[in-house]
Amino acid sequence: VLLDFFMAFIIAIVCIAPKYGMGSLNLKTTFYMGRLYFKVPFRYQTLGIYYLQLIIFAIIIVFIFIHLAMLLSLLFRNEYVAEIIASMTAVSGKVLYFSMGMGFVYPLLQKLPTTYFTIGDSLSGNLSYLMDSPGWGFNAGIIPLILTVLVIELILLVICRMKKCC
């Protein structure tokens, strides 16, 4: 997974950098914190930190999808069903958001890893705007994602030990 991201990064740099340059990773960007009546409704971080957080989220989410598909294919013995269920988990965060009343379910959604699968919304503050609540950034999203990785890996380990398939 890491090799794929590294190769995509190299290809993007080779294609874009000669024409536009590398840019400055120290450029400050603005992110919305949640509510306008806060003392500080916006925060400013560098583009380099944003890209680092984006890469970390992307690697963890791809890792979750690959291992979730492996787990589901071991359980159902059917790759087609496993991929359908894994794809449905990708959109379940948005479905819960719209079906349970927009903005009123944030205590539940903040703990679900599928909420943070929309990486740009999570990191830019758009998720804080949608939920009308602060704290939907990188620090809040990394914990459910890491816990999901650990749970999936633990279940895979238990199933593989029981079935002796790995």
Predicted regions and their residues:
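Hydrophobic, small-residue-rich membrane helices and short re-entrant helix-turn-helix hairpins
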Residues: 1-2, 166
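Secretory targeting signals
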Residues: 2-74, 121-141
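Junction motif at the cytosolic side of a transmembrane helix
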Residues: 71-75, 142-166
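Transmembrane helix segments
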Residues: 76-112
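Short hydrophobic, aromatic-rich alpha-helical segments embedded in or entering the lipid bilayer
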Residues: 104-129
